[in-house]
């Protein structure tokens, strides 16, 4: 294929290539599946991107929805044609994706729909100076529906049926207003089409009902009697609270919560049957009520021992330590249940960072505490798992990721260098100043859902 001609001028002062506008008809060749360099607005540099969709504006120009290669899909965006580097365009291979259907830009039409365990083995804790290991620095969701219209009825969030349907790869909501915050969503969420065609969706921060205008929101707030999430307040400390919400008893709230979360989670499938799930909503309290900052959900009965199905901190409240707080709370519940738990996989990139950070700190604290309580004694991975409620596989993977798990003279040992010990002791001390879960403020007892069902059947 002959590449389209493009005139380039060298800037005399900076030597930067400038592109002279090309014939608009040349952009007709750029179809779904094409890869080319695109000027990324957030970084002001060209990056390789794949064209997901395109549409024609009323003035006849074409704009393209692109996914930047090797970047998270929350960075996907609509771009004008002048940000494309046509000289770099690579057409999709034969047998690949079909070309995109060009649509007329209409806020009430299809464009917006598209935007639419082994044996217990004692592991010796070697003296800090016996062996040296390299220093390792530890780290800090509902993808698409199975179809573009009607989701299956299974559970609120699930990995089943993760789809790459082009329509659901396109962010279909431009903006939401939740409380005092206006937020740009990251991913597709199946809100009603008549709302996704609007510039902004307005959401009540207490009941999470979605409305089409500021006026409708004001009218709703005059009637809405809620000033906190439904369900039971099971934790309250330092103006932070957790509310436990049964997905069967509070279906409307649970479904609205899942829709809201889908805007910011990409690795799970959204379903409308919330009955099998419990939701734990974290709130900040002020004179007006309890304002949602994040949540996690879990299955009432999980054969895989998952203690978290989905977890999310809303963007305005990120980087405040709330992610670690949600994770810590989920493990406090597991400790009361006397079970080990693990989050449902896969985790988002941000979720994985948060979990690795929590696991690292929790495991290191337990190792140091064990060393003080039982000097000279050995510890097993199972011991660590039971004391922290972190599943055995996650304990092992964390020790390996920190380069602490070594094979030595026929058995596995945990090796902590003086350097690492000092680093983690400082981090543990610094963590004491951060917001933490106070177990004494947690008023909760686990429910045996399986036993109740068995009694009813009997």
From Swiss-Prot:
Domain Tudor-knot: 30-86
Lineage: superkingdom: Eukaryota
Places the protein is found: Nucleus
Enzyme class of the recorded protein, top EC level: transferase
Composition-biased stretches (Basic and acidic residues): 101-116
Residue ranges of the TM segments: none
Residues the entry annotates as binding acetyl-CoA: 311-313, 318-324, 348, 357
PTM characteristics: Autoacetylation at Lys-268 is required for binding histones with high affinity and for proper function.
Chain positions found as N6-acetyllysine: 268
Gene Ontology CC: one annotated term: nucleus
Record-level GO BP terms: cell fate specification; double-strand break repair via homologous recombination; negative regulation of cell fate specification; negative regulation of DNA-templated transcription; protein localization to chromatin
Disruption phenotype: RNAi-mediated knockdown suppresses time-restricted diet-induced lifespan extension and also the age-dependent decline in locomotor activity. Reduces expression of transcription factor daf-16 at transcript and protein level. Reduces expression of superoxide dismutase sod-3 and of hsp-12.6, but not of eat-2, daf-2, pha-4, hsf-1, and skn-1. Reduces resistance to oxidative stress. Reduces acetylation of histone H4, drastically at 'Lys-16' and modestly at 'Lys-12', respectively; does not affect acetylation levels of histone H3.
Zinc finger C2HC MYST-type: from-to: 201-226
Active-site residues, Swiss-Prot/TrEMBL: 344
Keyword Transcription: yes
E.C. code: 2.3.1.48
Keyword Iron-sulfur found: no
Occurrences of domain MYST-type HAT (ranges): 168-446
PROSITE patterns (UniProt xref): MYST_HAT (PS51726)
Annotated InterPro entries: Acyl_CoA_acyltransferase, Chromo-like_dom_sf, Chromo/chromo_shadow_dom, HAT_MYST-type, MYST_HAT, Tudor-knot, WH-like_DNA-bd_sf, Zf-MYST
Subunit structure: Interacts with transcription-associated protein trr-1. Probably a component of a complex with histone acetyltransferase (HAT) activity, at least composed of mys-1 and trr-1.
Described function: Probable catalytic subunit of the Tip60 chromatin-remodeling complex. Plays a role in acetylation of nucleosomal histone H4 and perhaps also H2A, probably acting as a component of the Tip60 histone acetyltransferase complex. Acts in the determination of vulval and distal tip cell (DTC) precursor cell fates. Involved in the positive regulation of transcription factor daf-16, probably acting by histone acetylation; thereby modulating stress resistance.
Protein name: Histone acetyltransferase Tip60 homolog
Biological classification of the source: Eukaryota, Metazoa, Ecdysozoa, Nematoda, Chromadorea
Gene name tied to this protein: mys-1
């Amino acid at each position: 294929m002959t590449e389209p001609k493009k005139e380039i001028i060298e800037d005399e002062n900076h030597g930067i290539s400038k592109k002279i506008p090309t014939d608009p008809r040349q952009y007709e060749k750029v179809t779904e599946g094409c890869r080319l360099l695109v000027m990324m607005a957030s970084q002001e540099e060209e990056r390789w991107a794949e064209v997901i969709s395109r549409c024609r504006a009323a003035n006849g120009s074409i704009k393209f929805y692109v996914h930047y290669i090797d970047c998270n899909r929350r960075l996907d965006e609509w771009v004008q044609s002048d940000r494309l580097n046509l000289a770099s365009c690579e057409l999709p291979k034969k047998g690949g994706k079909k070309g995109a259907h060009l649509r007329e830009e209409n806020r009430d039409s299809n464009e917006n729909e598209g935007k639419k365990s082994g044996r217990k083995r004692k592991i010796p804790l070697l003296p800090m100076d016996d062996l040296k290991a390299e220093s390792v620095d530890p780290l800090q969701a509902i993808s698409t529906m199975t179809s573009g219209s009607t989701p299956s009825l299974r559970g609120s969030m699930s990995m089943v049926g993760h789809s790459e349907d082009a329509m659901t790869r396109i962010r279909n909501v431009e903006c939401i207003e939740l409380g005092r915050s206006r937020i740009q969503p990251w991913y597709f969420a199946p809100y009603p089409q008549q709302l996704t065609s609007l510039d902004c969706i307005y959401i009540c921060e207490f009941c999470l009902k979605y409305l089409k205008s500021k006026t409708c929101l004001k009218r709703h707030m005059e009637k809405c009697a809620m000033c906190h999430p439904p369900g039971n307040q099971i934790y309250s400390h330092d103006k932070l609270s957790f509310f436990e919400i049964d997905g069967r008893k509070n279906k409307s709230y649970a479904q609205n919560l899942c829709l809201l979360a889908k805007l910011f989670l990409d690795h799970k499938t959204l379903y409308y049957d919330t009955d099998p799930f419990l939701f734990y909503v974290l709130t900040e309290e002020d004179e007006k009520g309890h304002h949602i900052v994040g949540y996690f959900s879990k299955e009432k009965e999980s054969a895989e021992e998952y203690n978290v199905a989905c977890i999310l901190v809303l963007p305005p409240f990120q980087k405040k330590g709330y992610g670690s707080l949600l994770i810590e709370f989920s493990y406090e519940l597991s400790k009361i249940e006397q079970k080990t738990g693990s989050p449902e996989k896969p985790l988002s990139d941000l979720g994985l960072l948060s979990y690795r950070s929590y696991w690292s700190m929790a495991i290191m604290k337990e190792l140091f505490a064990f060393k003080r309580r039982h000097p000279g004694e050995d510890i097993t991975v199972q011991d660590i798992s039971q004391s922290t409620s972190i599943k055995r596989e996650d304990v092992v993977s964390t020790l390996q990721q920190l380069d602490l798990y070594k094979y030595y003279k026929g058995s596995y040992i945990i090796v902590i260098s003086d350097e690492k010990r000092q680093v983690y002791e400082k981090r543990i001390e610094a963590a004491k100043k951060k917001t933490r879960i106070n177990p004494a403020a947690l008023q909760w007892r686990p429910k045996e859902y399986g036993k109740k069902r068995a009694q009813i059947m009997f």
